[in-house]
């Protein structure tokens, strides 16, 4: 790769910062030779970095005196904490000192700061969190994952465009199938938001397949599922809770039965492969789509592997020119976007 792509990591965001962020950054720098800027308290970061062999690694520190906590409001993150780690990270992105930002901190604050400093892509009214979920065949993109709890139909239509571009160039889906999440596949189903979004998407150039149900997210029969952020976040939390509950229940049943223990020993490779497939750490983070820059939002409880993979995903998003491709697709969907506006968004 000829292009130098530098990733800024909000090293103070998340439940286990900065240790997890530093460990993940070191792993990503070592494995993929990614230049990384850790943003946060210089003293704490120096202390954690001293535990690692950094020879040959391109890791720098940018000092930030404040931290946006999980209970801080997005408005406070924008207006009051102007030297927070997440704010400084996006300042670096805005100034083109880095090409992507990764954060496991307050997701609402991350989105607010990203929008405030980097602005929206022309033609996008609401940036969205695109979450990658495993399905029986590969992966499904779900958006919005929680950034916008109240949406209008044209927002969902824009989510479909953003998700389709991401699925095509990041997940290798040549012609991504896009569906609106509803309570049934029939056109008479759904609430007003879903039905109106359905009408808009039918008129688009996307490979729109109509309404899809919750079970379809994991079937592999749809590549991009759009919904408002309230529904999307509920879907994610239910999926996460169900996965943990099934694992715990299965583990409990195995412990109670001798033959089950023996069977588990034989099936251990399959269990490990399954666990890896459904582990959020393997997917790193959720891209924040729709801002003029690349942002990756990680789970607050992310481990080092999740941070490492999020850094890699961020680098790949920049390498694949996701924003440029999104601007081009928006131009196809909205011919009224003038050439000069599109060019401004790409610059």
Swiss-Prot record:
Its EC number is 2.3.1.274. Keywords: Cytoplasm, Lipid biosynthesis, Lipid metabolism, Phospholipid biosynthesis, Phospholipid metabolism, Transferase. It is found in: Cytoplasm. One of its GO terms (cellular component) is cytoplasm. Pfam families: FA_synthesis. Gene3D superfamilies: Isopropylmalate Dehydrogenase. It catalyses: a fatty acyl-[ACP] + phosphate = an acyl phosphate + holo-[ACP]. One of its GO terms (biological process) is fatty acid biosynthetic process. One of its GO terms (molecular function) is phosphate:acyl-[acyl carrier protein] acyltransferase activity. Pathway: Lipid metabolism; phospholipid metabolism. Homodimer. Probably interacts with PlsY. Belongs to the PlsX family. Catalyzes the reversible formation of acyl-phosphate (acyl-PO(4)) from acyl-[acyl-carrier-protein] (acyl-ACP). This enzyme utilizes acyl-ACP as fatty acyl donor, but not acyl-CoA. This is Phosphate acyltransferase. It comes from Syntrophotalea carbinolica (strain DSM 2380 / NBRC 103641 / GraBd1) (Pelobacter carbinolicus). The lineage of its organism: Bacteria, Pseudomonadati, Thermodesulfobacteriota, Desulfuromonadia, Desulfuromonadales.
């Amino acid at each position: 790769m000829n292009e130098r792509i530098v990733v800024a990591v909000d090293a103070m965001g998340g439940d286990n910062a900065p240790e997890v962020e530093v460990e993940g950054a070191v792993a990503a720098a070592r494995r993929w030779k990614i230049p990384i800027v850790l943003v946060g308290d210089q003293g704490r970061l120096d202390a954690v970095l001293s535990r690692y062999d950094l020879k040959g690694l391109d890791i720098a520190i940018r000092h930030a005196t404040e931290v946006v906590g999980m209970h801080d409001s997005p408005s406070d993150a924008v207006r009051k904490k102007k030297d927070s780690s997440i704010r400084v990270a996006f300042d670096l992105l805005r100034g083109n000192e880095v090409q992507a930002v990764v954060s496991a901190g307050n997701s609402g604050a991350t989105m607010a700061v990203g929008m405030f400093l980097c602005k929206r892509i022309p033609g996008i009214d609401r940036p969205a969190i695109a979450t990658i979920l495993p399905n029986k065949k590969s992966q499904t993109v779900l958006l919005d994952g929680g950034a916008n709890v109240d949406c209008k139909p044209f927002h969902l239509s824009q989510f479909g465009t953003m998700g389709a571009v991401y699925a095509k160039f990041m997940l290798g889906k040549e012609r991504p199938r896009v569906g609106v999440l509803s309570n049934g596949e029939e056109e008479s189903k759904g609430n007003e938001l879903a039905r109106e979004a359905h009408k808009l998407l039918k008129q688009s150039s996307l490979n729109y397949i109509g309404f899809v149900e919750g079970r379809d997210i994991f079937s592999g029969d749809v590549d991009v599922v759009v919904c408002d952020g309230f529904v999307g976040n509920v879907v994610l939390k239910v999926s996460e809770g169900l996965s943990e509950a099934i694992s715990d229940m299965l583990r409990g049943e195995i412990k109670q039965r001798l033959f089950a223990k023996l069977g588990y020993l034989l099936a251990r490779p399959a269990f490990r492969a399954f666990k890896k497939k459904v582990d959020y750490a393997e997917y790193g983070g959720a891209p924040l789509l729709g801002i003029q820059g690349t942002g990756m939002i990680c789970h607050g409880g992310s481990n080092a592997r999740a941070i490492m993979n999020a850094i890699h995903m961020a680098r790949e998003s920049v390498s694949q020119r996701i924003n440029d491709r999104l601007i081009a697709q928006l131009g196809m969907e909205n011919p009224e976007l003038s050439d000069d506006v599109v060019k401004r968004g790409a610059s």
